């Protein structure tokens, strides 16, 4: 099946997401990345990842591809939930180094393989995996629509997709609180903890520019996925997207 690569539909101004810049940024914050996630989300990032993994209903036979695997939280969680084999892909070498340490500590090295690679050109064969996941990484890809097409290519027919990504809450009560936090508190705390000036200024900018909800569903549909759903979590601060390769 040929997949049409469409341009982003948001019309919002995109921050610089050149692969070299993004990889360098994550290399710089890798040592404190897990701590930052816990601090900035109040520990909710772990809950959201568990929700994504649970949505896949793993049976113990699946081959899982975790793209933008970072420090391998979803890869490890998938293996613990019964995935037979997990391949994690990321283009930040430092993030993968920390992920590998966690895989070894979890004694899952026989079932998890971490590979350096690009989400827009995945180093896996077509129709080779049963499940594909991305947690909080798709918005960092220079061309998210190309990454979605690659996920579709990698999945076998009937394969399942789960993507976690930040959104923009529209609640009249929670929305203003979230916007204030993301614009003022998050960048300041992120800079202090990460010791990196740009990374947590980039975070709210990338969230604000990214397609979410129905707009991202359109990107998944254009890549070929069916049964696409977007489930808002925490009033839409995060979305869980699911789909199937028909």
Q: Model segments located where?
A:
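A short glycine-rich, Lys/Arg-flanked "PGG" loop and its adjoining helix->strand segment in the class I
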Residues: 145-160
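Conserved alpha-helix/loop element of class I SAM-dependent methyltransferases that forms part
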Residues: 32, 42-62, 77
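N-terminal, positively charged/glycine-rich alpha-helical extensions of SAM-dependent methyltransferases
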Residues: 1-32, 182, 193
